[in-house]
Amino acid sequence: MNDFPWLTTVVVLPIVGGSLIVLFPHKGNKTIKWYTYCICFIDLLLIAYVFCYHFELDDPLIQLTENYKWIHFFDFYWRFGIDGLSLGPILLTGFITTLATLSAQPVTRESKLFYFLMLAMYSGQLGTFSSRDILLFFIMWELELIPVYLLLSMWGGKKRLYSATKFILYTAGSSVFLLLGILGMSLYSSNEPTLNFESLTNQSYPVALEIIFYMGFLIAFAVKSPIIPLHTWLPDTHGEAHYSTCMLLAGILLKMGAYGLVRINMELLSRAHSIFCPWLMLLGSIQIIYAASTSLGQRNVKKRIAYSSVSHMGFLILGIGSISETGLNGAILQIISHGFIGAALFFLAGTSYDRLRLLYLDEMGGMAIPMPKIFTIFTTLSMASLALPGMSGFVAELIVLLGIITNQKYLLITKILITFVTAIGMILTPIYSLSILRQMFYGYKLFNTPNSYFFDSGPRELFISISILIPVISIGIYPDFIFSFSADKVEAILSNFL
């Protein structure tokens, strides 16, 4: 059974299953929804089965490899494989997409197209994390752009077309740099074009050329991560998108950029990364403070959460730039942690909007009394976002900071400055998080206004919220579960920097 193409099945199942939605009757909304849930859940079960029975945790090498000749003309392979770096994002993708699909139940307009796009996006994201061919990586990277654009432009707020256009201009524009970098790396060979990740890992380049490649990939991944100043598409996109789409953006899409930085910039271009890592740490430090302080000035609750995501991604950039085992493990943990927390906060903001039809914080207030369940869950996940001990966010950010402090590559004054700046960001985080709670849930503004939408969480919403809360607490208490499959791969990546 080990020869069975498990990864191809996992990647292809959602988009193939989604293509069959066209066969359903036009008015079968409920049938289409349950069919989509089943596709996502079956795929998640397949991912869990492959992880439990076919993946060796103590093996840092690529496992479950699949290698099929696809296009003979230029030696292009359908090549998949996973290791400790890709396993966490794949599990996160399956989990968040399944819950995001369940959260999209209120969507009734053009539901066939909506659920097909979600499944197509699912396949693209899984393919990106599983690819072992750099051109296949690019194809999967681009595959999820079109579904996201259509989800943004067709289901969202009044300015959805503007935000969708801004999203596609940023991401498609940055993809040009990604494609040029891929073509340059694959063609720089004495014999024949090389697209295999394993071959590219052993490829050496002149320093100047490696820096050019590195900058091209950095621009592409900085847009998706996002890294300032290439982040401005994110608040507009989150502010207008349907909250199920926001869950996929915050939970998975942002993590693709961080994954690319580690998989390509660190693993394939280690010399250039050594040159750029101090600048990455500087950018990460500035990003934490800038995004946290900007979040305080946002009236729109979804934009405030979006800027908080940008701030938390700053810790991830710090971990990647630290070139230390502790720091990089912390960055990988932050990928998983923020994937859960960011998706949960956007889901709760969206469910509140379903009831109140309000997004501006200064128009809200008094929700705690009529909606105690939403209030309790929102408060708990806000505590996770501000890195409360016992939650996954605390462990991830603490480990990143420890990776910087214990790193011998940087001067003491540099470590003190970075720690001081990030500490300011960590002080600003509870200010904007608690401000959201105060403006939404306390006071009497809405409580004294008769409103037919004032009802608390139902079983579906409670199930989604608790399903995300459980791993947030579990990782906070026992982060070694994540480190058990990432630590060996991190050690292998950092061996290139010795």
Swiss-Prot record:
Membrane topology: Multi-pass membrane protein
Protein EC: 7.1.1.-
Keyword field: Chloroplast, Membrane, NAD, NADP, Plastid, Plastoquinone, Quinone, Thylakoid, Translocase, Transmembrane, Transmembrane helix
Keyword Translocase: yes
Pfam families: Proton_antipo_M
Main localization, broad class: plastid
Record's catalysed reaction(s): a plastoquinone + NADH + (n+1) H(+)(in) = a plastoquinol + NAD(+) + n H(+)(out); a plastoquinone + NADPH + (n+1) H(+)(in) = a plastoquinol + NADP(+) + n H(+)(out)
Biological process according to GO: ATP synthesis coupled electron transport; electron transport coupled proton transport
TM regions (residue ranges): 4-24, 37-57, 80-100, 112-129, 134-154, 167-187, 208-228, 242-262, 272-292, 305-325, 330-350, 386-406, 416-436, 463-483
One Gene Ontology term of the molecular function aspect: ubiquinone binding
InterPro entries referenced in this protein's UniProt entry, alphabetically: NADH_Q_OxRdtase_chain4, NADH_Q_OxRdtase_chainM/4, NADH_UbQ_OxRdtase, ND/Mrp_TM
Annotated localization: Plastid, Chloroplast thylakoid membrane
Top EC class for this record: translocase
Keyword Ribosomal protein: no
Family: Belongs to the complex I subunit 4 family.
Name of this protein: NAD(P)H-quinone oxidoreductase chain 4, chloroplastic
Species this protein is from: Phaseolus vulgaris
